[in-house]
Amino acid sequence: MKIKTRFAPSPTGYLHVGGARTALYSWLFARNHGGEFVLRIEDTDLERSTPEAIEAIMDGMNWLNLQWDEGPYYQTKRFDRYNNVIDEMLEAGTAYKCYCSKERLEALREEQMANGEKPRYDGRCRHSHEHHADDEPCVVRFANPQEGSVIFDDQIRGPIEFSNQELDDLIIRRTDGSPTYNFCVVVDDWDMAITHVIRGEDHINNTPRQINILKALNAPVPVYAHVSMINGDDGKKLSKRHGAVSVMQYRDDGYLPEALLNYLVRLGWSHGDQEIFTREEMIEFFSLGAVSKSASAFNTDKLLWLNHHYINTLPAEYVATHLQWHIEQENIDTRNGPQLAELVKLLGERCKTLKEIAQSCRYFYEEFAEFDADAAKKHLRPVARQPLEVVRDKLAAIVDWTAENVHHAIQATADELEVGMGKVAMPLRVAVTGAGQSRALDVTVHAIGKSRSVERINKALAFIAEREGQAS
């Protein structure tokens, strides 16, 4: 039997981290078994589904590189199929037309609640022999079995049982002729030969209804696995107040897809004590039996740690392809400066996100209008004039422009003037970067370049001279 899973989001908003984790688990399970992964867009909610949301879901899946083997399928393009199946069920007696008015149903609901009963349809039209005109508005309901129970072996939670007496007759077609969500899902899973349905625990109550419909259609019943919810670090349901919840917001905030995937796979699943997983290792080790039943707590600090790890361990050339987008957002022209892969190596150790790198690198490519006020006040003082003049001349004299030779020039300046390295390095750092902090000074100066470094030192010397003039 070929394993076939699906990810079936409703396009009413962005792809959130909970949905992304479900997609990842479904994708990994299919890949682990050499199976296929289907993308299905469940857009039956015509009022809330939007093209923008569909695009956002696709963007998120593509950014995470969770490529699908089939699809995307759209439920709105399959309405004829759904209605044909409903018509067949009406003929077979496994579905029936319901003419009850909204007013009657509301009164029934209020009466049941007043009596402390669970609100449910009472089956009036199921047993009715009244004649109705062909054009009289009606819905179609599934004739749910009235005895026995539905038992399914959830691959994460174990056996789950529902009494059929607790399940009312589900509406499968509305008065406007459109099929309902729970019915469309059943026909889709049947037609697409889905063998394993991996989805959120909020779908557990839908499962017995869907199984009963599948059995009424003499269709195979897939295996089900329901993943627990994701909470914030305070134990409450994850929401925007806990930070970003959209997958693409994490892209915008400077996270690598490898970091988010690694974090999400561990958010409810484990393989021993291992924390870092390549994509290949995720595929090899993933199993539903190792997925926890308990809710997971989202910890942004842990995700940030993983992101920093991947920035510094993935090939710099690859990280640079993701950095490019952030550089463009900052409107930085990188033609006159270090290659982005070199920039990753320069700033990756200090910066934990790609956005931080992009916001920290402008001085490598563009001239800054002024020095950081605090750094200049502390380090661009008259006492720094001689160290800057000497190191400028030594840098200008370098023939083979390497970081090692830059380091020698800085060290030689300190030795010649018989001062500590800080007396040379700190004013030099402010001079060439405009700020008081940077990566190691030798590699920073090397990346900025000889002529640009010399020009900036001269600018710093002019700043010191002007400062002296104001003091006198």
UniProtKB/Swiss-Prot annotation:
<feature type="short sequence motif" description="'HIGH' region">
    <location>
        <begin position="9"/>
        <end position="19"/>
    </location>
</feature>
<feature type="binding site">
    <location>
        <position position="98"/>
    </location>
    <ligand>
        <name>Zn(2+)</name>
    </ligand>
</feature>
<dbReference type="Pfam" id="PF00749">
    <property type="entry name" value="tRNA-synt_1c"/>
</dbReference>
<dbReference type="InterPro" id="IPR049940">
    <property type="entry name" value="GluQ/Sye"/>
</dbReference>
<feature type="short sequence motif" description="'KMSKS' region">
    <location>
        <begin position="237"/>
        <end position="241"/>
    </location>
</feature>
<protein>
    <recommendedName>
        <fullName>Glutamate--tRNA ligase</fullName>
        <ecNumber>6.1.1.17</ecNumber>
    </recommendedName>
</protein>
<dbReference type="GO" id="GO:0005829">
    <property type="term" value="C:cytosol"/>
</dbReference>
<feature type="binding site">
    <location>
        <position position="100"/>
    </location>
    <ligand>
        <name>Zn(2+)</name>
    </ligand>
</feature>
<dbReference type="InterPro" id="IPR004527">
    <property type="entry name" value="Glu-tRNA-ligase_bac/mito"/>
</dbReference>
<comment type="subunit">
    <text>Monomer.</text>
</comment>
<keyword id="KW-0547">Nucleotide-binding</keyword>
<dbReference type="InterPro" id="IPR001412">
    <property type="entry name" value="aa-tRNA-synth_I_CS"/>
</dbReference>
<keyword id="KW-0067">ATP-binding</keyword>
<comment type="function">
    <text>Catalyzes the attachment of glutamate to tRNA(Glu) in a two-step reaction: glutamate is first activated by ATP to form Glu-AMP and then transferred to the acceptor end of tRNA(Glu).</text>
</comment>
<dbReference type="InterPro" id="IPR020058">
    <property type="entry name" value="Glu/Gln-tRNA-synth_Ib_cat-dom"/>
</dbReference>
<keyword id="KW-0479">Metal-binding</keyword>
<dbReference type="InterPro" id="IPR014729">
    <property type="entry name" value="Rossmann-like_a/b/a_fold"/>
</dbReference>
<dbReference type="InterPro" id="IPR045462">
    <property type="entry name" value="aa-tRNA-synth_I_cd-bd"/>
</dbReference>
<dbReference type="InterPro" id="IPR020751">
    <property type="entry name" value="aa-tRNA-synth_I_codon-bd_sub2"/>
</dbReference>
<comment type="similarity">
    <text>Belongs to the class-I aminoacyl-tRNA synthetase family. Glutamate--tRNA ligase type 1 subfamily.</text>
</comment>
<keyword id="KW-0963">Cytoplasm</keyword>
<dbReference type="Pfam" id="PF19269">
    <property type="entry name" value="Anticodon_2"/>
</dbReference>
<dbReference type="GO" id="GO:0006424">
    <property type="term" value="P:glutamyl-tRNA aminoacylation"/>
</dbReference>
<dbReference type="InterPro" id="IPR000924">
    <property type="entry name" value="Glu/Gln-tRNA-synth"/>
</dbReference>
<dbReference type="GO" id="GO:0000049">
    <property type="term" value="F:tRNA binding"/>
</dbReference>
<keyword id="KW-0030">Aminoacyl-tRNA synthetase</keyword>
<feature type="binding site">
    <location>
        <position position="125"/>
    </location>
    <ligand>
        <name>Zn(2+)</name>
    </ligand>
</feature>
<feature type="binding site">
    <location>
        <position position="240"/>
    </location>
    <ligand>
        <name>ATP</name>
    </ligand>
</feature>
<dbReference type="GO" id="GO:0008270">
    <property type="term" value="F:zinc ion binding"/>
</dbReference>
<keyword id="KW-0648">Protein biosynthesis</keyword>
<keyword id="KW-0862">Zinc</keyword>
<dbReference type="InterPro" id="IPR033910">
    <property type="entry name" value="GluRS_core"/>
</dbReference>
<dbReference type="GO" id="GO:0004818">
    <property type="term" value="F:glutamate-tRNA ligase activity"/>
</dbReference>
<dbReference type="InterPro" id="IPR008925">
    <property type="entry name" value="aa_tRNA-synth_I_cd-bd_sf"/>
</dbReference>
<keyword id="KW-0436">Ligase</keyword>
<feature type="binding site">
    <location>
        <position position="127"/>
    </location>
    <ligand>
        <name>Zn(2+)</name>
    </ligand>
</feature>
<dbReference type="GO" id="GO:0005524">
    <property type="term" value="F:ATP binding"/>
</dbReference>
